[in-house]
Amino acid sequence: MPRVPSQTPPAPPARWLAGRLAVVTGASRGIGAATAVAVAAAGAHVVLAARDGQALDGVAGRIKDAGGQATPLATDVSDEAAVERLFAEAGGMGRLSALVCAAAVLTPAPFAETTPAMWRETLEVNLTGAFLCCRAAFTAMVRAGEGRMVNIASLSGVYATEKFPGLAAYNVSKYGVIGLTEAIAVEGKEHGISAVCLSPGAVDTEMLRRANPALRPGLTPDDVAALIVALLDSPLAPASGANIPLFSNA
């Protein structure tokens, strides 16, 4: 009787993130923190950025305790010079491959009571911050010849979805993030740079609980982080420029 050779199952394909350098903003808590942990678990060296340095150190400590690589860098993403320092330091650690922009603020106020200062802070962190980080990452990725970005917007920025009252500045900032992602996709194509946007509904974060304690979110930060990692680990080019709404049924 002929001997049947044993068959070894094929090894799973290597994860795209494994061994790469990624920057995650808003990484001190919420979606950003969960994403930093998940990206590190996928094998990337993660540079964590947020204003709260103490909280960043805590998240970085969790990653290192689990055997991952993490570098916390306290950064105000609305400050151009601070963002330039962030990406200069990251560039000294290796070739930047991935960026996740999750930094955001949410200050609810009736439209008529929204002050120019409240408006400016929301737009500067949520939209200008994303622009500054994406621009710095884009420059590094052009040199590398490839790169992947995921920007976090919101259903608040998606056309024709129901909006909550008191979020005029937040809504506008998230519409802008979606448009920014589309622009990056257009100009990044020739350089091998892809960008997609995620627009979650209600996610169970500290920021949302402060803004609307009565809301019962249907998504967790870990849910969103898992999708971000799945996107980064997949070829993004066919979907570059897309906005993916996540309905949480809150």
Predicted regions and their residues:
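Active-site-adjacent segment of SDR/Rossmann-fold oxidoreductases
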Residues: 162, 183-193
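Conserved glycine-rich cofactor-binding loop
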Residues: 21, 28-29
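Conserved NAD(P)H cofactor-binding loop of Rossmann-fold oxidoreductase domains
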Residues: 102-108
